Amino acid sequence: MEKEIVFCKGGGCTAKLGPEALKHVLDKIPKAKDPNLLVGFEGSDDAAVYRISDDVAIVQTLDFFPPMVEDPYIFGQIAAANALSDVYAMGGDVKTALNIVCFPEKMDLNILGKILTGGNEKVMEAGGILAGGHSIADVDVKYGLSVTGTIHPDRIFKNSGVRPKDKLILTKPLGVGIIATADRVGEASEEAMDKAIKSMTTLNKYASEIIRKYDIHACTDVTGFGLLGHLHEMLQNEYTAVIQSKSVPYIKEAYDYANEFLITAAGQRNRNFVESFIEYETDDFAMQEILFDPQTSGGLLFSVNPEDANKILEDLHGLEMPCGIIGEIMELQEKEIIIR
């Protein structure tokens, strides 16, 4: 792998503000009142949705962050795939994207060219058009996209809406944050990084298109708040989810690195925010860290009727990405999340 970006500190979605700090600020922002704003920021959804006609709504999102890999082209691909993912988590289709660039004035512009090339290729793969962007000089590289998509107003996937007996399905393996952390200190194997990069550069477009054929009750993508943080947002303290940890897909090496305490500060922020809602029926430390691990360009997490779960899983297996039925929803218990 070509190594040209050598300052990967807290890159990817590990760079996000912690959920507790973010909630503290957003709770003080007045909520917009417009009947055509179908999804705003009040529900922790992945993107905003605004209705422009009876049949069409626009989906808007943006995401950018510092590098988590040292190859600029791959970084561009990952950052773009991550930004595009929010449209797919809502059930929409990508139409246009704008580059968001922070770049040091004294750095080789060829590096920026490689980042933008990687990003553009993912936008094209998504079926979208790169239509422009904005750049500023900064001490560190940061890159991402502002993305616009479309969706039918009656077919939006929200992150709320789970129902008792629903099955929870995850479409990508966990552990990329832990592996990137291990790589920054020279402890990750090439095989582990290859697995992480394959996951992070895979668009959620394909999984989203599959699950739209079914009755999806709630959906989100797993990113900086980790699986348990995003699951907490889905449950809204109204239901309980039972997670079968042995059914959760993850990259094997991430488990080994977690046992060696190669874990992220962002993962610990996620643990601190969510842990009071959790009951552990297993003392597997490494698995706990994987469940809290911030993901960059992570998979879709969705709830669905139990009778559809196995058929959806069969369809998803055709994408050749580890996925699984990881748990189920039940009426609210003493704790919101139970880990078995």
Swiss-Prot record:
Annotated site, Important for catalytic activity, chain positions: 16
- Which Gene3D superfamilies does the annotation name? PurM-like C-terminal domain, PurM-like, N-terminal domain
Give the enzyme's EC designation. 2.7.9.3
How and how many cofactors are bound, per the record note? Answer: Binds 1 Mg(2+) ion per monomer.
Q: Which SUPFAM superfamilies match?
A: PurM C-terminal domain-like, PurM N-terminal domain-like
Molecular-function GO terms, alphabetical: ATP binding; magnesium ion binding; selenide, water dikinase activity
The record lists the catalysed reaction(s) as: hydrogenselenide + ATP + H2O = selenophosphate + AMP + phosphate + 2 H(+)
Q: Which InterPro entries match?
A: PurM-like_C_dom (IPR010918), PurM-like_C_sf (IPR036676), PurM-like_N (IPR016188), PurM-like_N_sf (IPR036921), SelD_I (IPR023061), SPS/SelD (IPR004536)
Positions contributing to ATP binding: 16, 43-45, 63, 86, 133-135
- List, from the UniProt record, the residues annotated as the active site of this protein: 13
Binding of Mg(2+), residues? 46, 86, 221
Q: Does the keyword DNA-binding apply?
A: no
Q: Which keywords does this chain's UniProt record carry? A: ATP-binding, Kinase, Magnesium, Metal-binding, Nucleotide-binding, Selenium, Transferase
Q: Which GO terms describe its cellular component?
A: cytoplasm
Q: Name one GO biological process term.
A: selenocysteine biosynthetic process
Necessary cofactors: Mg(2+)
This molecule's function is given as: Synthesizes selenophosphate from selenide and ATP.
Instruction: Spell out the subunit comment.
Output: Homodimer.
- Please give the family membership noted in the entry: Belongs to the selenophosphate synthase 1 family. Class I subfamily.
* HAMAP family reported for this sequence: SelD (MF_00625)
In Swiss-Prot or TrEMBL terms, this protein is called Selenide, water dikinase
Q: Which gene encodes it?
A: selD
